[in-house]
Amino acid sequence: MGKLVAIWGSPESGKTTFAVKLATAVYNQFQSTVLTILADQTAPALSVLFPNRKKEDLSSMGMVLAKTEITQEEVIKCIVTDPKRANFGFLGYMDGENVHTYAKAGERKCRDFLNVTKTLANVVVVDCTSLPDNLSKVAINMADEIVRLASPDLKSMAFFNSQLPIMADTSFRCEEHILGINVVRQDVYIPLEEAKEHFGKVSFTVPYSQEIRIQTINGALIEPVKDAKFNDRLRIVAQKLVE
């Protein structure tokens, strides 16, 4: 069974980008089979990662979660792959889909789904929703490692001040979260040290990368990054989470 890594964080903290780049770092560093699950139904990410793919070349994991029984065969059918990399795939929702497209999957079915994905990959990275849906709740509960991602701004601080008390339930395992700060903007003044002081024990900081910003604009997030500082930091984080 593969290792499950859950990425949860505040809105606009760069969770999806971080999840994709972390999966890439794991793939490159450990020569692993890696699956990235994109849980968001409010802004489906498959069309963001694969903007030039025809709709008929993409598949939605919503079709799997809507089935009575979840099998390896059905999950494999819905994996979207990168033609440049073997054993590196994505599961998510398609452009135009939303929370009403498919029947809501219960937590038991989400657990079955995640267990199947763990039989298909060495590492499964789950990009959880900021307000956890059933799939995200189960992923956090099942995860071998949980990353809580914040951005160094007042909005992120306000989000966690509001949501962490709600997540006091032991199933969210807040005391086990690995806290990271992701610098997603290049502002004149970034209150990074103040953010670290506010959030407490910060395990890592992801530096701002102009190259990542350009990839985001161009719909090229699955492409390699040459930014040495960014890559070095992701390698360190990948090693901490996977080894």
Feature names for model-found ranges:
Residues 123, 145, 201-204:
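Well-ordered beta-strand positions
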Residues 7, 37, 92-93, 125-127, ...:
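Conserved beta-strand segments of the P-loop GTPase G domain that flank and frequently precede/overlap
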Residues 2-42, 46:
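Walker A/P-loop phosphate-binding motif and the immediately C-terminal alpha-helix
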Residues 36-119:
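P-loop/Walker-type NTP enzyme "switch/lid" segment
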Residues 119, 134-153:
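Inter-motif core of Ras-like GTPase G domains
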Residues 218-243:
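NTP-binding/hydrolysis catalytic cores, primarily Walker-type P-loop NTPases
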Residues 102-114, 161-186, 223-228:
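P-loop/Walker A phosphate-binding loop and immediately adjacent motor/lid segment at beta-alpha junctions
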Residues 183-187, 192-224:
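Beta-strand-loop-alpha "switch" segments that mediate conformational coupling across diverse proteins
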